[in-house]
Amino acid sequence: MEIQLSIQCPTIRKEIGWEGKSEDVVRFEGGTIADVLKSIPTSNGETFYDRFIRDDHTMIANAVIWHNVVYFVQRDELDRKVNDGDKIVLLRRIPGGGG
């Protein structure tokens, strides 16, 4: 399966060797967001899943996954189905406040 992956955080792009690009086609086995994350290697030999998913299989607090640019994946929805050609955007929350 292939999806369009966009990574909007320069630090994450560097970790996976994407310096100079922010979007690419990713091929992977399986059919869930977790499978996509498991297919992305990082510079230290882990996968993106290893790096950003906690032992209870939820995302770390500052990771954000946007599916098809219409749905923000909740921390416990890594089994959300993806289809060939879908777009996944990976973001990091920026601390700050308003109000």
Specify the residue positions occupied by each region the protein language model found.
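Ubiquitin-like/PB1-type beta-grasp interaction modules and other compact soluble beta-rich domains
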Residues: 1-99
